[in-house]
UniProtKB/Swiss-Prot annotation:
<keyword id="KW-0378">Hydrolase</keyword>
<comment type="similarity">
    <text>Belongs to the Ap4A hydrolase family.</text>
</comment>
<dbReference type="InterPro" id="IPR029052">
    <property type="entry name" value="Metallo-depent_PP-like"/>
</dbReference>
<protein>
    <recommendedName>
        <fullName>Bis(5'-nucleosyl)-tetraphosphatase, symmetrical</fullName>
        <ecNumber>3.6.1.41</ecNumber>
    </recommendedName>
</protein>
<dbReference type="InterPro" id="IPR004617">
    <property type="entry name" value="ApaH"/>
</dbReference>
<dbReference type="Pfam" id="PF00149">
    <property type="entry name" value="Metallophos"/>
</dbReference>
<dbReference type="GO" id="GO:0008803">
    <property type="term" value="F:bis(5'-nucleosyl)-tetraphosphatase (symmetrical) activity"/>
</dbReference>
<dbReference type="InterPro" id="IPR004843">
    <property type="entry name" value="Calcineurin-like_PHP_ApaH"/>
</dbReference>
<comment type="function">
    <text>Hydrolyzes diadenosine 5',5'''-P1,P4-tetraphosphate to yield ADP.</text>
</comment>
Length: 293
């Protein structure tokens, strides 16, 4: 039995199938972790969701910002953007079934045996593991509650407040939690977010750093798997931090990592997110087997 984690799919099903075939993935024995952003921008969002739903018993999934956007669109809370490729899902006869499954997924996964956490974007430096799990559960509860879901989806959009405060209440509180877990890249040591900068490690605004580079980060010693940040190309140069979004939907590649060994496979993609006939081992500095103790 093997456990793999895969980067942002964004509706790119071919590369995923290519990688699963390469490792002889067996849904009856193996497990696949998904870092979120299962859909949108790529050519096969509906097919991707259906494929994953069909093997749902073998999956662990955390939600990304695009997945939450889909849930909002399905509830007619948010209109689709011109760049969205979600219309086919919304018009599908099994849309309600797929959305019901999607809203049951996590915002954060923690494997206690492996001491590994998985989130879409990151964990802010001021939160401990215990607090991060607690706050993630608050959003997960809203997603799964028929009465709480509409106001949450309606209020989750926005960049403010930019910083966590334990006294925050209601939808405002859930918005900040959601932004940390699904949109964060750069922040201050106190957790103040900059949600405009989206490029590489050296493009941080003054006073900001990538969330994982803060020396006083309270989750140091914890191995964290995340996606979301394609500009990193999987390289973070930080022990215990595993970045898996390698931009498959932008003509980069889709990356699959063995969670236990840290070994990675990469499937190159064209500019439309389709798989190219190349699957190669990928070794980076950001894929240690375990975090430092």
């Amino acid at each position: 039995m093997a456990t793999y984690a895969v980067g942002d799919l964004q509706g790119c099903l071919e590369p995923l199938k290519c990688l699963l075939q390469q490792v002889a993935f067996d849904p009856a024995l193996d497990r696949l972790w998904l870092v979120g952003d299962l859909v949108n921008r790529g050519p096969q969002s509906l097919e991707t969701l259906r494929f994953l739903y069909g093997m749902r018993e073998s999956l662990v999934c955390v939600l990304g910002n695009h997945d939450l956007h889909l849930l909002a669109a399905a509830k007619n809370i948010e209109r689709l953007k011109k760049s969205d490729t979600l219309r086919e899902i919304l018009e599908a006869p099994d849309c309600a079934e797929l959305m019901e499954w999607l809203r049951q997924q996590k915002l954060m996964h923690y494997d206690e045996q492996r001491e590994v956490a998985m989130v879409h974007a990151g964990i802010p430096p001021q939160w401990s593991l215990r607090k991060a799990l607690k706050y993630a559960e608050e959003v997960e509860t809203a997603l799964r509650d028929d009465n709480l879901l509409p106001p949450f989806l309606d209020g989750m959009y926005g960049n403010e407040p930019a910083k966590w405060d334990s006294d925050l209440k209601g939808v405002t509180r859930l918005r900040v939690i959601t932004n940390y877990f699904t949109r964060m890249r750069f922040c201050t040591a106190e957790g103040k977010l900059d949600l405009k900068s989206k490029e590489g490690l050296d493009t941080a605004p003054p006073g900001y750093k990538p969330w994982f580079q803060h020396k006083e980060r309270k989750t140091r010693g914890l191995r964290i798997i995340f996606g979301h940040w394609a500009a990193l190309e999987g390289n973070v140069h930080e022990p215990g931090i595993c970045a898996l979004d390698t931009g498959c939907v932008w003509g980069g590649s889709l990356t699959l990592m063995n969670v236990d060994s840290g070994e990675r496979l990469s499937c190159k993609c064209d500019e439309h997110g389709a798989a190219l006939p190349t699957v190669a081992p990928l070794i980076t500095e950001s894929s240690p087997v375990s975090a430092p103790r």
